[in-house]
Amino acid sequence: MSRAVAVACTAALCAVPVVARLHAQSRWDVSFGATGAQEIVRSRVGTTRERLSGLVFSGEAVATRGRLVARLRYGQGRVTADAAGRDVVEGEALLGYKARPWLTLWVGPHARTFVVPGQSDQRWLLWSGRVTARGSLFPGRLESFVELWQGFTGSLNRPAGSAGGGGAEAGLELRLASRPFWGRLAYRIEQGRVDGGRRETVEALTLTVGYVPLR
């Protein structure tokens, strides 16, 4: 697990120069964050079911210019059951458009790899469309948000096949007055499916601490 934490911290530190460079261009608003997630993975193949849980640490970077938004996330961790475990690597690269100040439309790939000792890696790749809606609870301080997504094409490498899926995330974001830090508490659920009855459902409770340079 310490390796996953180190990777997440390294990713966040590497993002700092990029954030500073983009922020220096007045047309860009940028931020980055570090997330810890308690994940529960439920796997079903036919009548066989498996439940695993563990911690996943990730980093994210968001850049906004006018109505355009780009979001990158990458994380690593490990989920375990009584007798076995899997390393988890996940990430996404999304391009968004702010249709309204409170509504953002997204498109892009989301990938997750499960590494099981003695077996080939299992890789899910889904291209999805997403919608994020926000509501202000305390203007400029506290917001609620809901994000829904649906995959329109995808694949699983083992066993090879076409994949589909969808998910949702909801939570709260807090921004401190005259401070460059923000926080997010959220719940996320998503599911990947392939023909033959195979399903992978991932639930996560996430806590994010972020930084955005003040103008």
Describe each model-derived feature in a short phrase.
Residues 56-60, 90-94, 128-132, 167-171, ...:
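Membrane-embedded beta-strand positions in outer-membrane beta-barrel channels/transporters
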Residues 69-98:
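Surface-exposed loop and membrane-interface regions of Gram-negative outer-membrane beta-barrel proteins
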Residues 1-29, 214-215:
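Cleavable N-terminal export/targeting peptides
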Residues 52-56, 86-90, 124-126, 163-167, ...:
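Membrane-spanning beta-strands of outer-membrane beta-barrel proteins
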Residues 67, 100-103, 112-199, 210-215:
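Outer-membrane beta-barrel transmembrane domain signature
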Residues 4, 22-24, 72-74, 176, ...:
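Positively charged, low-complexity intrinsically disordered regions
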Residues 22-80, 206, 210-214:
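Short glycine/proline- and aromatic-enriched beta-strand/turn motifs that initiate or cap beta-hairpins
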